[in-house]
């Protein structure tokens, strides 16, 4: 597939290292100021950003038109071009999303725990910002504002590295954000967009820029996430795949199962929370398998199944071993009959990606076991896998979904963009 020109905008590697080091130092200083900013000031800054994005709409759309034209000339797919394209309505939605972040509760300064020791020490655990968040994303220019706003709300600075195809648009949005921050008396450098398309800049960000970057969040395809996870010298909040399962267990209502399966798979096939595998319990296969497969096929979804699923409908093609570990991101699903709850859990453990998995059943004991034993960031009972979203969780927005075990897991919203410190209050105690 043709790609956009990724040639460095800079003269040599030394220039790039100097540029990135300066961005890191300015972000660290801005992050310190943001960490100390009162909640009201941060919210004023976010509302000023939203106003400036609206005021800058003509400039943003002009730069977006240039990005879209270049993408079309490079032969990028219609799906990528659609993600890249903005219009007046989409720009307005970007501004509105920033305002919604301003309306969230401040995650900084909350008392997470408090206790008194036998020696009279009073100890508090208090939420504090992470510091500097590096966000590396591809073709969605709205990520500039979405991710930046979440970082700012949590008292962080952000270094944003846009994909080459959205670079001009992201630059225009980031400029509006910096201007809004300055109007509110906050450091404009709390939002910085890497001003080069050079992929070497990503490598420098992954080193942590000499201790100036505290965490990296990649937003993009598998190749980007694989590179970030392999090369990063700082913590990463990310997921590699969204291989999500819907398990129709014994005790499942057929009507509910049909509705939840179609929503989990077909509402939006290209998102990480879309179901990729259907598991049907052998105890209900005789009554549930055929109508569920027919519903998928009639909705335009191709089905790749095991022998039992192929026998249910001649339109089902044979599944290979690779299908059970494939994130299709398309109107395709693999389907299999399993011999009970233990077999379903074992299949998910062997083939899943620890993202989102669902059980459909009226058996509360079986549901409790599934929710307890399936080791995924999100597990649902009688609910669509496509609820794997920060907005649906009431987080207001998300910077991504994390499937790792350290710090953030599931939707990464403003609370997950904080860490904590301990405050210890004494009255002259010394340690014996």
Curated annotation (Swiss-Prot):
Keywords: Amino-acid biosynthesis, Cytoplasm, NADP, Oxidoreductase, Proline biosynthesis. The keyword Protease does not apply. Its EC number is 1.2.1.41. Pathway: Amino-acid biosynthesis; L-proline biosynthesis; L-glutamate 5-semialdehyde from L-glutamate: step 2/2. Gene3D superfamilies: Aldehyde Dehydrogenase, Chain A, domain 1, Aldehyde Dehydrogenase, Chain A, domain 2. It is found in: Cytoplasm. One of its GO terms (molecular function) is NADP binding. GO terms for biological process: L-proline biosynthetic process. The keyword Oxidoreductase applies. It holds the Pfam family Aldedh. It comes from the Bacteria. GO terms for cellular component: cytoplasm. It catalyses: L-glutamate 5-semialdehyde + phosphate + NADP(+) = L-glutamyl 5-phosphate + NADPH + H(+). Catalyzes the NADPH-dependent reduction of L-glutamate 5-phosphate into L-glutamate 5-semialdehyde and phosphate. The product spontaneously undergoes cyclization to form 1-pyrroline-5-carboxylate. Belongs to the gamma-glutamyl phosphate reductase family. This is Gamma-glutamyl phosphate reductase. The gene is proA.
